[in-house]
């Protein structure tokens, strides 16, 4: 056992040992490195798999009662200052090591096929290995200073991968946006670290918390200063985990390759913020005001992310807002002192979200040969539909992830989300209402994405048919039960009609064209319209390769069974679960009422499952493949009520589609404000700061030139100067006698 702990540093070193030679080879021997690129990929997968094996070994040692292990070596030593580096192995570290290495290995296997067509394949694996190494280094860090070093390395890798296709302007802008947004949080994190070091004289987690509690007990430090330092420290996780109001970078981060989106959203960058709050939980717990702030930031983020996911047409952006919402759940759980449940949801969400992102990558990979390699088309759900028939394994695994994130038992996220809903309700009715409403929205938008992507007919054929001047009806992204005669001449216009951006909720009756090659029938006042089917020759997507399907199947299995670690077991009237045994040291601020038997547990779970099914039902009504419309009922609808409903729904739609207008506010207040301030500062510097010395210099130049001309030895100049002086004297004499007679 001692041997395993002693060499735990090898875990982050293994992916680093693959990243460095790949990167150096790409710089100095690009041709030779690219010629054996598959070999480098296999080496990367093998080394990370070894790291995963070691992580499981450390994990088993911890959950079977192994001791917490700390190892330090001194880097800088003098009389007043010492700096130690090392690693820390405890239950939190071991769980995160397993999480990062398992998801990272699956992403690497997946990327080998997904990125095979890309000429920057080698550079991608160099970044990917370094990304995994940085996150693993962050996880095992024993002090704040070492965490900050790896925190910045994780950020740097994420910026490199978000802007991986930097020749694309949108990717370059997304990279800059992520960098600038995270600068605000990271600067606060650095100030908070330095502030706590000034107070306690240490960067180590355990000593930091103990010393702070001692100083607080004897009033040795001001509460305002400590709270301010904790707030600055919390800014780092707010930015890194995309919490309100520093969340704006996360949706734009979808410009990176899809495997990176899976890694960022599941196990690395956004998980780093939650991990840091969990690591510093004893410190934050001693400050009630900060805990209250953490809970409110989490609650607002959860609700805001869910509302902004409702109207997204881009598959990956919809999943990005879903991640933002789920991270809000975790932060809320930490804020209400549900430490174990927050980490439980971090684990279940990681595997479910990795599955969903890799599934979306499989869809995009199959759509690109048909619609082109532009993200606006290959990721546009308006051009998808019916993919389950052509990609059954991808469709089934995506459905598993959708059910899990929606909170449907027995999938992973149900067990963790249900406990968050229960604890938040016990803590505060306001937080209970936020989490329950968000749970319903989550089920709605997740099934909306699934139905638009995998059910119905393949809608690219509608665009192709339209380009051949065949009249079609549009399929609204909001389940709009209408048909329009499309008379535009571009496929993009067709896509805009499919999205239904302007009149997304109108309930006009179907105007079925005589030229439409569809089927319809009337039955009891209902019009049943079957999806359009064109008999011509069209291209259809096909299932991805085995290298991409294998990670989907493995993550699907994790999604089915990983929730068992938090499932309660009742014995002798007591409640047990595996995860609680791993985090036996965590305490609660008050006695939370937990169910005492299975029947009580299921009764408590009924409302959360019910609201999830309600969201799914609404999504199925709006986005089902076959559309039903009662014409008689619709025509009898009160027109005033219809106008009010349409206006209300359009407000909700615009709020969601334009991301709650937050980006617009930031553009007006921050970006344009800073640019205006910079222009004003530049003008002041140019005309005032530089203008005064430059003006004096120019004045001296002109005076000197004038004196040079006067003293040049020319008689005409002397005469002119003499006459000029006489004239000035006469004028002065005349005006002086005029004013003073």
From Swiss-Prot:
GO CC field: chloroplast thylakoid membrane
Enzyme class name: translocase
Chemical reaction(s) catalysed: a plastoquinone + NADH + (n+1) H(+)(in) = a plastoquinol + NAD(+) + n H(+)(out); a plastoquinone + NADPH + (n+1) H(+)(in) = a plastoquinol + NADP(+) + n H(+)(out)
Localization, UniProt: Plastid, Chloroplast thylakoid membrane
A GO MF term: NADH dehydrogenase (ubiquinone) activity
GO biological process: ATP synthesis coupled electron transport; electron transport coupled proton transport
Record keywords, A-Z: Chloroplast, Membrane, NAD, NADP, Plastid, Plastoquinone, Quinone, Thylakoid, Translocase, Transmembrane, Transmembrane helix, Transport
This enzyme's EC code(s): 7.1.1.-
Record membrane topology: Multi-pass membrane protein
UniProt main location, coarse: plastid
Residue intervals passing through the bilayer: 9-29, 40-60, 89-109, 124-144, 147-167, 185-205, 218-238, 258-278, 286-306, 327-347, 354-374, 395-415, 427-447, 550-570, 601-621, 651-671, 687-707, 719-739
Family from the record: Belongs to the complex I subunit 5 family.
Binding partners and assembly: NDH is composed of at least 16 different subunits, 5 of which are encoded in the nucleus.
Function summary: NDH shuttles electrons from NAD(P)H:plastoquinone, via FMN and iron-sulfur (Fe-S) centers, to quinones in the photosynthetic chain and possibly in a chloroplast respiratory chain. The immediate electron acceptor for the enzyme in this species is believed to be plastoquinone. Couples the redox reaction to proton translocation, and thus conserves the redox energy in a proton gradient.
Name listed for the protein in its UniProt record: NAD(P)H-quinone oxidoreductase subunit 5, chloroplastic
Native source organism of the sequence: Cryptomeria japonica
Name of the gene: ndhF
